[in-house]
Regions:
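Glycine- and acidic
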Residues: 8-13, 96-100, 120-126, 145, ...
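Charged catalytic and DNA/RNA-contacting regions of genome-maintenance
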Residues: 1-119, 132-135, 139-148, 152-244, ...
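Amphipathic heptad-repeat alpha-helical coiled-coil/stalk segments that mediate oligomerization
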Residues: 1, 6, 55-59, 67, ...
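Amphipathic alpha-helical transducer elements in NTP-driven molecular machines
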Residues: 17-25, 77-81, 90-93, 107, ...
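ATPase nucleotide-binding head domains, primarily ABC-like/P-loop NTPase cores
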Residues: 17, 88, 99, 270-299, ...
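Amphipathic alpha-helical "coupling" segments that flank catalytic cores
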Residues: 118-124, 530-535
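Charged, surface-exposed helical/loop "interaction arms" that form contiguous linear patches used
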Residues: 149, 153, 163-166, 219-220, ...
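Amphipathic alpha-helical coiled-coil segments
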Residues: 110, 117, 127-133, 160, ...
Length: 543
């Protein structure tokens, strides 16, 4: 395996980060083992993941909020991703999932996404044209990986060509865009005409599935391949042509060109004409009535005819390798265009969802206020179909509304309400519009959740132990900018002990961590306990 030089590591901007260098080495070693190659090319660029730039979402939050898969079914359906993913391309699906799992912390970046989504919302004709144009676009990133690792076949190259042919139309649609992000997409789309032209001129329209079948290279692209194909397709005609040519040159009317397994191709002349045989003929066999000769030209042709198919397949494969190498040299241009198309796909998807579901553009601030008017749970609303979702308000800030206590009976919607606030906050920070009449979202650095009850048989932990461990992690990691969702904590033990734990946790979250918190209780007695502590001024009770 090739070792990266200090200069290469420096170019990747990771030389000063020892952990990043170690991680890069591990990735390259993994690629070597899985791709079965002795030498792995260094990556053209690396993106450093800065945790300070993205909202923190631990596995518990991802699971409880059902971001990418449903807890009930274990698949995408009925998750938040299922609601917002209306993308048309494979790369777009990967990117929208990445956005969902990494909400932004920068108001400027969020606003750029919002403006692009808003522009597409306001221009339905443009949005529909873009989504239609993206339909059928191949996965350039995956194709490029196969091309770089020399595993792409001719059909996959034609698939890439088909996608490149769509680029001029897609780019033209963005020419008059006004938002920063759509302008950036326009500038980043490289038409890649040289690559499209190369594939179009080299590969037949309907190539075979495997590269060892031959028949991949177009006629006229390579003269050696054309010659071999001509020999393969018209071997008998070529022999007849040589026979007529030699008759005219020698004046021997009964000259024949034949073939046997011993001598291969030969020229046969009867004894009555052997005096006319030119000196360039080489005698190979004497028979009773004739002589048999060979020429250098005939031997060369024999070699071409006999091995024409094998050599043609080999030459076509060599040519395919050269084409793949030429495309690999343009990897940065292809990657940039692929990312631009994926970004456009995601923005079009978010705008489609916003228009179809009556979402609004939230106001993003740094003051810690979460103020939602007529908010709706995006997944529950999608599942209700013809039944309207009953909207509700929410307000959290860093002052007297730091915490909301939600009380009510089982199946009253307490968990749905709390998850709704978290999901609206998360959607706002990925740059999406949100299901509400209006929304003001103060940037959240993390969402922590403690929802549901289950034990862990593998580690021998009871339901109560699992719950307390999760709460401890939240109390340790939460900051004043975090949003905490606590659903009936303390239910894994006795009523009195559970309320004591709940009160202590609530005081710590609001007084020590100063975090915004949503907490639900089945038992209304908790209100009187908090009132007794003089703590009610910092809470808003929802019943």
């Amino acid at each position: 395996m090739r070792i990266l030089s200090a200069a290469e590591i420096e170019e990747l901007n990771v030389s000063e980060n020892e952990i990043a260098v170690c991680a890069l080495g591990a990735v390259i070693l993994y690629l070597k083992d899985t791709q079965k190659k002795d030498e792995i090319e260094a990556p053209s660029e690396l993106e450093m993941y800065d945790t300070e730039k993205y909202m923190k979402l631990d596995m518990s939050a991802r699971r409880n909020l059902e971001l990418t898969k449903s807890m009930m079914t274990g698949d995408k359906r009925h998750s938040l991703l299922w609601v917002i993913d209306k993308t048309k391309t494979a790369a777009g699906k990967r990117m929208i999932r990445s956005w969902l799992e990494r909400p932004l912390m920068s108001i400027a970046k969020i606003t750029k996404r919002q403006n692009a989504v808003g522009e597409l919302c306001d221009n339905p004709i443009l949005r529909d044209e873009i989504r239609q144009a993206l339909t059928g676009v191949s996965d350039i990133e995956r194709l490029l990986t196969r091309i770089v690792y020399s595993t792409a076949n001719a059909k996959e190259l034609k698939s890439l060509q088909s996608t490149l042919e769509k680029l001029p139309s897609i780019k033209a649609k963005l020419a008059d865009s006004s938002s920063y992000l759509l302008k950036a997409v326009y500038n980043d789309i490289d038409l890649l005409e040289d690559i499209r032209s190369l594939i179009d001129s080299a590969i037949v329209d309907e190539p075979p599935f495997t590269v060892r079948e031959g028949g991949m290279i177009k006629e006229g692209f390579d003269k050696d391949i054309d010659e071999l194909k001509s020999i393969m397709n018209d071997g008998a005609g070529i022999i007849a042509s040589i026979e007529n040519e030699q008759r005219e040159l020698t004046g021997i009317p009964k000259l024949k060109v034949g073939y046997n397994k011993v001598f291969g191709y030969y020229i046969e002349v009867t004894n009555s004409y052997k005096d006319l045989v030119p000196e360039t003929y080489i005698r190979k066999q004497t028979l009773t009535n004739c002589e048999r000769y060979i020429t250098q030209e005939l031997k060369d042709l024999e070699g071409k005819i006999i091995g024409a198919k094998e050599r043609c397949i080999a030459l076509e494969y060599q040519m395919l390798c050269k084409i793949r190498e030429s495309i690999s040299n343009e990897v940065k241009r292809l990657q940039k265009t692929a990312r631009a198309l994926a970004t456009l796909d995601v923005l079009a998807s978010l705008s489609e969802v916003a228009v179809n579901n009556n979402y609004v553009c939230p106001q993003i601030t740094n003051d810690g206020t979460i103020n939602i008017k007529d908010g709706r749970h995006p997944v529950v609303e999608a599942l209700l179909e013809d039944t309207p979702f009953v909207p509700n308000d929410a307000k959290l800030d860093l002052n007297e509304n730091r915490c909301e206590i939600i009380t009510g009976p089982n199946m009253a919607g307490k968990s749905t309400y709390m998850r709704q606030i978290a999901l609206i906050t998360l959607l706002a920070q990925i740059g999406s519009f949100v299901p509400a009449k209006s929304a003001q979202i103060g940037i959240v650095d993390a969402i922590y959740t403690r929802v549901g009850a289950s034990d862990d048989l593998a580690t021998g932990q009871s339901t109560f132990m699992v719950e307390m461990n999760e709460v401890a992690e939240i109390l340790k990691n939460a900051t004043s900018r975090s949003l905490i969702i606590l659903d009936e904590i303390g239910r894994g033990t006795s009523t009195f002990d559970g309320m004591s734990i709940a009160r202590a946790v609530l005081e710590f979250v609001c007084k020590q961590k100063n975090a915004r918190c949503e907490i639900s209780f089945l038992r209304r007695i908790i209100t009187s306990l908090l009132l007794w502590r003089g703590f009610l001024t910092e809470l808003r009770i929802i019943q």
